[in-house]
From Swiss-Prot:
Protein name: Tryptophan synthase alpha chain
SUPFAM superfamilies: Ribulose-phoshate binding barrel
Disulfide bonds: none
Keyword Membrane: no
Subunit structure: Tetramer of two alpha and two beta chains.
Tree of life domain: Bacteria
BP GO terms, sorted: L-tryptophan biosynthetic process
Its EC number(s): 4.2.1.20
Length: 253
């Protein structure tokens, strides 16, 4: 059993809280202070490595990716910072990155991720067929490859993903790109209700969450929630996010 599956199996709260931040935004110093201050509230940290064409992201995260890249944030600086700051030593971190950032020296990169104490990878542009062949290599370095499912995933493909997924399932519960939504989409709720009957693997709701009432409504349906764009929007506006972050966290208890 993978480290993350074991973590979900032993969870003692209603939902795992999985905040998403883009590496280096608004600065490495801010992230280090904020994340370590709140490490006991963060069950898993999803950290995005800035990329020039983040196809799954809405306008907020696209802008944040751009600003981080302009400042020179990349995969190497992200890994160096994780080690230097102690963030990956104190918090379970999964990286979101695009495959062409690592494919040329794949095994060398996976070893470095392991040495950095990364727990898993989310790779939006990785075809399922390639993911299937890579899972043994990821397992060699004790890294979870986290797979996506969505309401548009075909039944045959869904069965294959549910069977081969080595970790929790990242449920894209709305159509389109990342971003805040005012309410939970009925399609997403019914989709996850159906999937829940077909697998015992943990399900995590991604995309569209922005407030505590949405999170509270997901208790009993999913095992964890990811909040990214709503946090990023407040950071873009130079807002103090602590009170908002605490509100989201309390909703997962």
């Amino acid at each position: 059993m993978s480290n993350l599956l074991e973590k979900f199996k032993n969870k003692s709260k209603s939902l795992f809280f999985i905040p998403f931040f883009v590496s280096g935004f608004p600065s490495f110093d801010f992230l280090e202070v904020f994340l370590l201050k709140n490490k006991d509230k963060i069950d898993i940290l999803e950290l995005g490595v800035p990329f020039s064409d983040p196809v799954a992201d809405g306008p907020v995260l696209q802008e944040i990716n751009y600003r981080a890249m302009v400042r020179g944030v990349n995969l190497n600086s992200t890994l160096d910072w994780l080690v230097r700051s102690g963030v990956s030593r104190n918090i379970d971190v999964i990286l979101l990155l695009y495959f062409n950032l690592i494919q040329n020296k794949l095994e060398e990169n996976l070893k470095r991720f392991k040495d950095t104490e990364i727990k898993g990878l989310v790779i939006p542009d990785l075809p399922m067929e390639e993911a299937e062949t890579l899972i043994p290599l990821f397992n060699k370095y004790n890294l979870d490859l986290i797979l996506f499912i969505s309401p548009t995933t075909r039944d045959e493909r869904m069965k294959k993903i549910l069977k081969m997924a080595p970790s929790f399932l990242y449920c894209i519960s709305v159509k389109g790109v990342t971003g805040e939504r005012d309410k939970l989409p009925e399609e997403g709720v019914s989709f996850i209700s159906r999937i829940k009957k077909e697998t015992d693997k943990p399900l995590v709701w991604g995309f569209g969450l922005s407030n505590s009432s949405q999170i509270a409504a997901l208790k009993g349906l999913v095992d964890g929630v990811i909040v990214g764009s709503a946090i990023g929007k407040r950071l873009l506006n130079n807002e103090d996010i602590q009170e908002y972050f605490d509100e989201l966290y309390r909703a997962t208890l």
